[in-house]
Regions:
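Conserved PLP-enzyme active-site core in the AAT-like
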Residues: 32-258
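Conserved N-terminal alpha-helix of the aminotransferase class I/II PLP-enzyme fold
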Residues: 1-44, 66-74
Length: 258
């Protein structure tokens, strides 16, 4: 069912989301996109997709506060260690990398100071150690810069901001650059390069090829959390009559029940 893209289940995708995902992926020069409930969800899902207990992430020291807290508190409480560093200082970046480092995470322009990340240089260090570079391009937008062209492997956005244009809807997007070889170190990136027992033993790097990263999030993580995200978005997006009576009733009952 993963070899051919399609609307296989409501919590995973629908026709409207598919158009949005394809367009953002095309703008970024990626092979596939995935729309989620918020920018925070995009950051969380991207890191959870490859990080687990005993793993390590190197993160830039100029991150949006929510992303910083996710890494230093939430993921840390789940057994993921971290090093916060000025990623533009390549010696410090190199020194921060450990054998169990599975991602380098940075922003094109730091939020809120807009200091610029040297993506080309950071990507070169990351790839020399066979580590994917995840870039939050919310402030950059593909109109100004396409991080994949500079070496980023995964690009994420809070679509609530510049992509949405008005801050009137919540949303996030994950774009798969399709260039990182997850099978080069199958033990390290086992969630993508080894059989997944929670999804019929599928090896996502095989069945989804270049789109393995976003496909696993869609198939596994959204399988577990997608209904909550879709429901929250329905409740929040009241524009243009989107609050149909059934949704209004469901939202009210949810909030009344706590």
């Amino acid at each position: 069912g993963l070899r051919d893209a399609g609307n296989i289940y409501g919590r995973l995708t629908n026709s409207t989301q598919d158009v949005f995902e394809r367009r953002v992926a095309a703008l970024e020069g990626g092979v596939a996109g995935l729309a989620v409930a918020s920018g925070a969800a995009a950051v969380t899902y991207s890191l959870q997709n490859i990080l687990g207990v005993g793993d390590h992430v190197v993160a830039a020291d100029n991150l949006y506060g929510g992303s910083f807290n996710l890494i230093t508190h939430t993921l840390a409480s789940q057994g993921v260690s971290y090093t916060i560093v000025n990623v533009n200082d390549l010696k410090l970046l190199e020194a921060a990398i450990r054998p169990n480092t599975k991602a380098i995470y940075a922003e094109t322009f730091g939020n809120p100071n807009s200091d610029v990340t040297n993506i080309d240089a950071v990507a070169e260090v990351a790839h020399r150690h066979n580590i994917p570079l995840i870039i939050d391009n919310t402030f950059g937008t593909p109109y100004l810069i396409r991080p994949i062209e500079h070496g980023a492997d995964i690009v994420i956005h809070s679509a609530t901001k510049f992509i949405g244009g008005h801050g009137s809807s919540l949303g996030g997007v994950i774009v798969d650059g399709g260039k990182f070889d997850w099978k080069k170190d199958a033990e390290k990136f086992h969630t993508l390069a080894k059989p997944d027992p929670s999804y019929h033993g599928a090896v996502f790097a095989d069945v989804a090829g270049q789109a393995a990263f976003v496909t696993r999030i869609r198939a596994v993580i959204l399988r577990d959390t997608g209904r909550i995200c879709a429901f929250e978005y329905t409740c929040m997006d009241g524009e243009a009559g989107n609050f149909i009576p059934a949704s209004r009733t469901a939202c009210r009952k949810c909030f009344e029940s706590g």
